[in-house]
Amino acid sequence: MAKGSTRGAGSLRGSWLVSGVVTCACLMAALALSGRGSKAYTAYSLAVHKTKAIPAFARKYGLPCSACHTAWPELNAFGQAFRDRGYQLGNDRDSPIWQNPSYIPVTFRMTPNLHRESATKQAVDAVPGDGTSGLVSKTITQSGFDLSGMDLWTAGTLYKNISFVLLPSSDNTGAFHFEAAFVRFDNLFSNRWVNFKVGKFELDNLISEKRFLFLSGNGGAYQGYHFLPAGDVNDFGLGDNQIGAELSGHSENSYTRYGIALLSSTDGEVNLPTNQGYDAFLTLSHAVDVGSLGVERLGAYAYLGRRPTYFQTSVGTPIPGTGTGNKPFYRIGLAGDFFFGDFELLPFVMHASDDAYLATGTAANVALPPGARDARWNSGFVEAHYYVNPQLVFTGRWETVRMSQQADPTLPSDLGNIDAYSGGIRWYPIMFSRAGLSWHTEVSAVRTRGSAFAATDNVWTTSLFSGLDFDF
């Protein structure tokens, strides 16, 4: 289904109204309620801050899940520090040699659900089944019971100060791949500022797309993390796990953190499908504890990459891994994680640029189209969570993507612009060291500028989602 679509005008207004009302209600309720006597969860109790949960850690250390999580799968400040230490608390239980032989640090996660997806201004045959009847604009709607993909996540320590993650993950048909797989050497030279890992891992984004509280078809990804302008052949996504090596470090409480990663230019794909190039990702963040309000964190990041524009060929067929004519791109910006009692605010801004050859899909050994230039855009979002208690969370998010310069000057300046809205409720009837269950309900809507019929069309995609997100 095309990414940006619409329905009839009445249906369009209705779906947008529902999304807007839910999002605004969540945000306004949070703002109003957060002014009450704060039950602020700090790094030392049921803190409100951010990873994928693994109940095996709670079993291993005899801790409640709330010791590391605001609302599973988000980590709080204590959970962030636990992860930064290589899934270690600094006691005798860190090394697996002290564990019962029957202990296996593994978690399964899946979400049976009921959802409805709708997309406007989709190109369909005027007469179904007749490819010669011409194309007309229609709204496509699907609904029914479904399954999510499945994560089989295991992580922990191979030995003291040697940690690992292995995450085989499948789509909802059962087709598996490795979402993450790495080994990390912690506290090298007895120094918490020197940790080194190699493998496939999530970029050290302050706001993690792998651990956030949205699951629907339109709300379950950050638009700005994956946006590319029309005609761009770059494959990079800031939310995609990458393959490479990372040097990182942190203060004792992980309030100050840095990361430097050297990555293959493959966007996380195995078998070196593109070229022999490398990308770099740099992050730096600092947090302060402001007492009853919580822990406030601000971070900066920069991703500097290159992608090939053409390949060596054999009898006209591209040879994998021989990409050349590399051209640069970058993503830079700021992100925050701020608490006001039980209200959490997550702002994010990004400036992005892709070289003209990438943005126009032109091989570097031929001339650019007349007037071609680098594509540039800005994106951002504001996400809000209100934690009524450790078992009930209201969520809301607004996102925007705005082109500042099209690679092709003949294109409308706003082609590809995005506005996205999401809101939802997440209730945890159970969450303990053996298993967790969340009833997740969400509504999301995305408006994209430009359709198959006109560059000035506004195309809407909407999602209504309710599911049982469980792990054990």
Stretches with model-predicted labels:
Residues A2-T51, E74-P112, H250-E252, L262, ...:
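Post-cleavage N-terminal segment of exported redox proteins
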Residues A181-F185, F189, S292-F472:
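Outer-membrane beta-barrel pore domains
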Residues N76-A77, F108-V127, S137-G268, T274-S292, ...:
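Outer membrane beta-barrel
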Residues K52-P64:
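Local sequence-structure signature of Cys/Sec-based thiol-disulfide redox active-site neighborhoods
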